């Protein structure tokens, strides 16, 4: 990691990611180096909406959301490394390998996500990620992300519903 610290506050994160409450899972970027790594934080609050059902009386941060938080960190790293998206483009989570969960994350924890660029090939970028609480590993994974092409402008299409007569759909059989 570099000694030249780069941080991003929530306003800058909101400018890069399309996610919003309750699905924005990166609170701050603590450090990054373009094309190399990014370290971010998620402050886990008891007020998170999913704790009502996951699990009542024993709240645990869902593992899939730990992975999503790491994926959002990879998105920020990609944007800072490759530039902002063009209108109509989307940067999306394309796959995950070797996800492992080591211990639960609970309300009050401060989860640190560390992601590193591995390689880019055929439009897919591969990253490794580690999530930690108090220096202890809670999750590791390899993630793939893809940058989509801008969508072609939609043509004006008029859709006319088929006219179906009730007696054709439900024919009435008359008894002779």
Swiss-Prot record:
Keywords from the UniProt entry: Cytoplasm, Lipid A biosynthesis, Lipid biosynthesis, Lipid metabolism, Lyase
Residue positions of the active site: 54
GO biological process, one term: fatty acid biosynthetic process
Pfam family, any one: FabA
Subcellular location: Cytoplasm
A Gene Ontology term for the protein's cellular component: membrane
Keyword Nucleus belongs to the record: no
Record field: catalytic activity: a (3R)-hydroxyacyl-[ACP] = a (2E)-enoyl-[ACP] + H2O
InterPro entries assigned to the protein according to its UniProt record, in alphabetical order: FabA_FabZ, FabZ, HotDog_dom_sf
Enzyme superclass (EC): lyase
Sample GO molecular function, one term: (3R)-hydroxyacyl-[acyl-carrier-protein] dehydratase activity
EC numbers, comma separated: 4.2.1.59
PANTHER family xrefs: 3-HYDROXYACYL-[ACYL-CARRIER-PROTEIN] DEHYDRATASE
Task performed by this protein: Involved in unsaturated fatty acids biosynthesis. Catalyzes the dehydration of short chain beta-hydroxyacyl-ACPs and long chain saturated and unsaturated beta-hydroxyacyl-ACPs.
Homology family: Belongs to the thioester dehydratase family. FabZ subfamily.
NCBIfam families named in the record: fabZ, PRK00006.1
Protein name: 3-hydroxyacyl-[acyl-carrier-protein] dehydratase FabZ
Species of the source: Yersinia pestis bv. Antiqua (strain Antiqua)
